[in-house]
């Protein structure tokens, strides 16, 4: 088993870190550079910065936040939000990012994945996939053709890809999309369950496992982390390569080192 990664996620709005529930009700969680330094000291393997308003409000990313962080933190930094062109990739990589995460722009223009991976290398291209369970009312629905159907106690459903910060459904099946981005040259998938986001009830194991098993790419599980036990579960049962978390770290409910020790106790390899 490859070494698993623990990755704090910093959702950034107007230069501050914020956190919400199910992509809504945002509250302030601190300064991105200061938080990055803390997580670096705690032993985080990487950091993810998501400018959560950039795609929707068509705003450029706060390049200076990336620059200031990259000057003080020396673990890999992934940056996403509002990135639409190869030139956007170039600017943010130049500012000090190691990888670029694209979501809305990848759905709107899948060729961007191919283009960016050819220019900067697949290791630089992370495709973020925001997913919501879409429950089926009529099993004869003609739009279900080619979609992967799952069952839960609440009924049958499929996993739908959302864009614009979770504001717009696409009608695209998440498993089909994951396979497509792999073929186009993505180096990694950042997979967020919108249903689990901010709930602290645990990752969506069904979703994570389904995506992890359908591609050879590393999958970062995101959405719902409320404890070290949830991280252990997503590694053991969801086959995730990395676990992303926000609230439990930002509000000091635990720290990276404690999570890693718990993971290690369960015979899962991590960098201590």
UniProtKB/Swiss-Prot annotation:
Which segment of the chain is annotated as a signal peptide? none
Show the active-site residues. 11, 130
GO cellular component terms, alphabetically, are: cytoplasm
Q: Which InterPro entries match?
A: Aldolase_TIM, His_biosynth, HisF, IGPS_HisA/HisF, RibuloseP-bd_barrel
UniProt-listed SUPFAM superfamilies? Ribulose-phoshate binding barrel
Gene3D superfamilies reported for this sequence: Aldolase class I
* Single GO term (MF): imidazoleglycerol-phosphate synthase activity
Q: What is the reaction catalyzed?
A: 5-[(5-phospho-1-deoxy-D-ribulos-1-ylimino)methylamino]-1-(5-phospho-beta-D-ribosyl)imidazole-4-carboxamide + L-glutamine = D-erythro-1-(imidazol-4-yl)glycerol 3-phosphate + 5-amino-1-(5-phospho-beta-D-ribosyl)imidazole-4-carboxamide + L-glutamate + H(+)
- The EC designation for this entry is 4.3.2.10
Provide the top EC class: lyase
Q: Which domain of life is it from?
A: Archaea
Annotated Pfam families: His_biosynth
Q: Enumerate the UniProt keywords alphabetically.
A: Amino-acid biosynthesis, Cytoplasm, Histidine biosynthesis, Lyase
Q: In which pathway does it act?
A: Amino-acid biosynthesis; L-histidine biosynthesis; L-histidine from 5-phospho-alpha-D-ribose 1-diphosphate: step 5/9
Where in or outside the cell it occurs: the entry states:
Cytoplasm
Q: What GO terms describe the biological role, i.e. biological process, of this protein?
A: L-histidine biosynthetic process
- Which CDD domains has this protein been placed in? HisF
* Family, per entry: Belongs to the HisA/HisF family.
Query: What does this protein's UniProt record list under function?
Result: IGPS catalyzes the conversion of PRFAR and glutamine to IGP, AICAR and glutamate. The HisF subunit catalyzes the cyclization activity that produces IGP and AICAR from PRFAR using the ammonia provided by the HisH subunit.
Annotated HAMAP family: HisF (MF_01013)
Q: Which NCBIfam families match?
A: hisF
How this chain assembles, per its entry, is: Heterodimer of HisH and HisF.
Q: What is this protein called?
A: Imidazole glycerol phosphate synthase subunit HisF
């Amino acid at each position: 088993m490859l070494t698993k990664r623990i990755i704090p996620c910093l959702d950034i709005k107007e230069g501050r870190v914020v956190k919400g529930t199910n992509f809504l009700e945002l509250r302030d969680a601190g300064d991105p550079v200061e938080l990055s330094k803390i997580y670096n000291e705690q032993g985080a393997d990487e950091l993810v910065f998501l400018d959560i308003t950039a795609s929707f409000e068509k705003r450029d990313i706060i390049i200076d936040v990336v620059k200031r962080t990259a000057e003080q933190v020396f673990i890999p930094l992934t940056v996403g939000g509002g990135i639409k062109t190869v030139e956007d990739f170039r600017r943010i990589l130049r500012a000090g990012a190691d990888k670029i995460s694209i979501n809305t722009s990848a759905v709107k223009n899948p060729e961007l994945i191919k283009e960016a991976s050819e220019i900067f290398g697949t290791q630089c291209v992370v495709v973020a996939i925001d997913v919501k369970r879409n429950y089926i009312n009529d099993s004869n629905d003609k739009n279900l053709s080619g979609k992967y159907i799952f069952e839960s106690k609440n009924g049958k459903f499929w996993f739908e890809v959302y864009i614009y910060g979770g504001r717009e459904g696409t009608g695209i099946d998440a498993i089909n999309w994951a396979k497509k981005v792999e073929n186009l040259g993505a180096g990694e998938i950042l997979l967020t369950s919108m249903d689990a986001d901010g709930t602290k009830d645990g990752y969506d194991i069904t979703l994570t496992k389904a995506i992890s098993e359908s591609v050879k790419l590393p999958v970062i599980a995101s959405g719902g982390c409320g404890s070290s036990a949830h991280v252990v579960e997503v590694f053991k049962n969801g086959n995730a390569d990395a676990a992303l978390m926000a609230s439990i770290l930002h509000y000091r409910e635990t720290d990276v080192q404690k999570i890693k020790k718990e993971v290690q106790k369960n015979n899962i390899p991590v960098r201590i």
